């Protein structure tokens, strides 16, 4: 018997230990989304061990990414488990799915409340303290040369499959960044995004783009003209 229970965290879920009476039932086969970033890979592997060793389940890790996994879980009920999910990527649709009983959040996670946005490195802000708003950054593409075309500013975005890839592409268009001298840097993967930051930090180079926690660049709430 396969446990047809869709488990989805509203932030990040670690450890599937809240099965209640289901834990004593025959477990059967379970699929777990193995998302394309490191912390999600780790959590998927830990959940696999817990389910196999603790509950006798047959567990398969399947490739996943935020939006494709959410869509598949919502529409097809597969995979069964997403041990890590960024809720703000699809918060309206997620809340609706939870309200309708299509998905369920189980327990609080050890990693919650992470911010995300546009960032620069500390050494950049120290040298250019005026760069604290999106407008100030976008006026200086010369400070952030694109790795493939130094005549343009490089704006690093999320890997394919992350909802923030779409939102950052939309921001790129909304801010008319191409006309301001910018071009998107395709990071390709979570490792590629991380590596671009690490490389810039090691070399003392400037870096601008999307990430989880560095030096936050505020974006005004006024409507764009």
Question: What are the residue ranges of the model-derived segments?
Answer:
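A conserved helix-loop-strand patch within extracytoplasmic ligand-binding domains
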Residues: 103-157
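Short helix-initiation/N-cap motifs at beta->coil->alpha
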Residues: 37-38, 58-75, 183-195
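Single conserved hydrophobic/aromatic residue that forms the stacking wall/gate
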Residues: 215-225
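Short, well-ordered beta-strand elements
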Residues: 26-39, 57-62, 152-156
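Pocket-flanking alpha-helical
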Residues: 44, 62-102, 196-200, 218
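C-terminal segment of classical bacterial N-terminal signal peptides
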Residues: 14-23
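Short, polar/charged alpha-helical segment
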Residues: 39-57, 171-173
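Paired acidic/hydrophobic, glycine-rich loop segments that form the ligand-binding mouth/hinge
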Residues: 80-85, 205-211
